[in-house]
Swiss-Prot record:
Organism for this UniProt entry: Dioscorea elephantipes (Elephant's foot yam)
Protein name as it appears in the record: Cytochrome f
GO CC terms in record: chloroplast thylakoid membrane
Entry's family note: Belongs to the cytochrome f family.
PROSITE patterns: CYTF
Swiss-Prot/TrEMBL keywords: Chloroplast, Electron transport, Heme, Iron, Membrane, Metal-binding, Photosynthesis, Plastid, Signal, Thylakoid, Transmembrane, Transmembrane helix, Transport
Subunit structure: The 4 large subunits of the cytochrome b6-f complex are cytochrome b6, subunit IV (17 kDa polypeptide, petD), cytochrome f and the Rieske protein, while the 4 small subunits are PetG, PetL, PetM and PetN. The complex functions as a dimer.
Transmembrane segments: 286-306
Keyword Chloroplast: yes
Details of cofactor binding: Binds 1 heme group covalently.
Co-factor requirement: heme
Subcellular location: Plastid, Chloroplast thylakoid membrane
Signal peptide: 1-35
Length: 320
């Protein structure tokens, strides 16, 4: 009886351990697959290189358009909208990590001038919150509040992303001035082709690593292929591994060249970057401009009145 209880206890512990292990795997895998902006955050101190190139282009190789819209000028300590548009054909499907086809996701990085930052929730109006949807923005670094990243997000719902931005106040931030500032943006649709470690994803074309004859093609049980090539130079065998997702373009017995595509290129997405300018406007300048315009209008009114008065005097003198 005691042995039976011991066996049941051990069995229960093993079952719990397996369950916990599965849960950890699922959670970890989900966090990695759904958090690709963290690749740039972990690998680069600044997402914009000295050349002006945004580092997301290192993984998303295809070039696609992106657009940003901001106000021409804003006042200090004011919340405004920065609208990023990532256009693409909504009918397109991308290759997922499991080799199946699915909808495209989108992501973006917004690089603001120093002092500008994501608006706190209590400063965002209900109208702007409705435009934002359920997106969760985050800072690129805890000490870089002017750089904001978002994604991945469902592309069909968020091909237009509204960032709520709070402008700085030079009265409280002495390193901020009333000037014209640049804003940079990068946006992608779809998965990348290269991982940060340099390895390929299954969302890209695979080329032959050797010239020769395709001697054997083995379709793997879980998807993908093993392609054996007899090297043309010395006859040794080279095995190229193709993951599930890309479509095979070669067949057994075919003669191929070095770097010849073995698969199609399944990528339908891409990355783009753009920029805009915004003026941090001094309220005193606006007041001065309004005062100047008012004085000009008053001067014109007085001039017209004076002219009419002069005409009346002339008419009176002519009557006598």
């Amino acid at each position: 009886m005691q042995n039976r209880n011991t066996f049941l206890g051990v069995k229960e512990q093993i079952t719990r351990s397996i369950f916990v292990s599965i849960m950890i795997y699922v959670i970890t895998r989900a966090s990695i697959s759904n958090a690709y902006p963290i690749f740039a955050q972990q690998g680069y101190e600044n997402p914009r290189e000295a050349t002006g190139r945004i580092v997301c282009a290192n993984c998303h190789l295809a070039s696609k358009p992106v657009d940003i819209e901001v106000p021409q000028a804003v006042l200090p300590d004011t919340v405004f909208e920065a609208v990023v548009r990532i256009p693409y054909d909504m009918q397109l499907k991308q290759v997922l990590a499991n080799g199946k086809k699915g909808a495209l996701n989108v992501g973006a990085v917004l690089i603001l001038p120093e002092g500008f930052e994501l608006a706190p929730p209590d400063r965002i109006s209900p109208e702007v919150k409705e435009k934002m949807g359920n997106l969760s923005f985050q800072n690129y670094r805890p000490n870089k509040k002017n750089i904001i990243v978002i994604g991945p997000a469902p592309g069909q719902k968020y091909s237009e992303i509204v960032f709520p931005i709070l402008s700085p106040d030079p009265a409280t931030k002495k390193d901020v001035h009333f000037l014209k500032y640049p804003i940079y943006v990068g946006g992608n649709r779809g998965r990348g082709q290269i991982y940060p470690d340099g390895s390929k994803s299954n969302n890209t074309v695979y080329n032959a690593t050797s010239a020769g004859i395709v001697s054997k093609i083995v379709r793997k049980e879980k998807g993908g292929y093993e392609i054996t090539i007899i090297d043309a130079s010395d006859g040794h065998q080279v095995v190229d591994i193709i993951p599930r997702g890309p479509e095979l373009l070669v067949s057994e017995g075919e003669s191929i060249k070095l770097d010849q595509p073995l698969t199609s290129n399944p990528n339908v997405g891409g990355f783009g970057q753009g920029d805009a300018e915004i003026v941090l406007q001094d309220p005193l300048r606006i007041q001065g401009l309004l005062f100047f315009l008012a004085s000009v209008i008053l001067a014109q009114i007085f001039l017209v009145l004076k002219k009419k008065q002069f005409e009346k005097v002339q008419l009176y003198e002519m009557n006598f």
